[in-house]
């Protein structure tokens, strides 16, 4: 009588229970497959929601309208690891719509999406949000058309400029108004984008809004607390830094 070895016992078991083992292998494979699909699906939904939020608000953690603090001072606070700059030289005279341009960091933060066209790349080019076109009664304007706008510089004298439309943007600036104690028209993000050289107007001054990414470990409430002041009577004064609350609304307190 032959001695039974482990290999022979295993082989005999496989032959006897072949269908059961095949079913077990298929079951394990399907379980792994469905779990992988579920994980990928959840990840895809998360990424899609993140992309929609970025298109609506940008990916920055905070912003500061008309920020006069220097970048060196801001970085020395230890709160930030990236700063983008949005420059406002003027508003559109008839609709009070802010006109401006981004530096590369701000453009990367804001993730502007286009219904048609692209960003301005040279002097004389302009990109306009869809809602701004409606306010200016330029609904029929498309990429390649020319528009003549009266620009009111910040604390300056009106100038008339003609541009070629190179982009029609999805709406975003209205979502970034934030809380502000100021009522000036330029205290908004631009719905009209121009090339930086077009910001060289004869009069007025430039206003700069800043966008921030927080340094590792920094939370929104910590950044807000850094700028909060309490007087002798216990009254609190909040800073001009804006973060996003749980509903993605900008707030400075």
What are these regions (language model features)?
Residues 10-17, 40-44, 97:
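Short, functional N-terminal and low-complexity linear motifs
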């Amino acid at each position: 009588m032959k001695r039974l070895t482990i290999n022979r016992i295993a082989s005999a078991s496989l032959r006897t229970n072949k269908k059961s083992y095949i079913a077990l292998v298929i079951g394990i494979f399907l379980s792994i497959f469905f779990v992988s699909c579920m994980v990928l699906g959840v990840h895809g939904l998360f990424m899609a929601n993140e992309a929609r939020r970025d298109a609506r608000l940008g990916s920055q953690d905070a912003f500061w309208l008309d920020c006069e603090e220097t970048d060196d001072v801001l970085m020395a606070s230890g709160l930030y690891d990236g700063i983008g700059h949005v420059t406002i030289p003027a508003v559109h005279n008839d609709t009070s719509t802010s006109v401006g341009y981004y530096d590369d960091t701000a453009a990367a933060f804001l993730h502007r999406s286009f219904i048609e066209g692209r960003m301005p790349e040279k002097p004389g080019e302009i990109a306009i949000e869809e809602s701004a076109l409606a306010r200016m009664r330029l609904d029929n304007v498309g990429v390649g058309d020319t528009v003549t706008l009266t620009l009111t510089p910040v604390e300056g004298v009106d100038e008339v400029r003609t541009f070629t439309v190179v982009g029609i943007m999805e709406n975003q600036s209205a979502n970034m108004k934030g809380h502000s104690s100021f009522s000036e028209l330029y205290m908004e993000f631009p719905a009209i984008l121009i090339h930086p050289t077009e910001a060289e107007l004869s009069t007025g001054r430039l206003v700069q809004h800043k966008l921030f990414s927080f340094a590792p470990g920094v939370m929104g409430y910590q950044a807000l607390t850094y700028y909060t002041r309490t007087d002798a009577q216990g009254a609190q004064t909040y800073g001009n830094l804006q973060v996003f609350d749980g509903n993605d609304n900008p707030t400075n307190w």
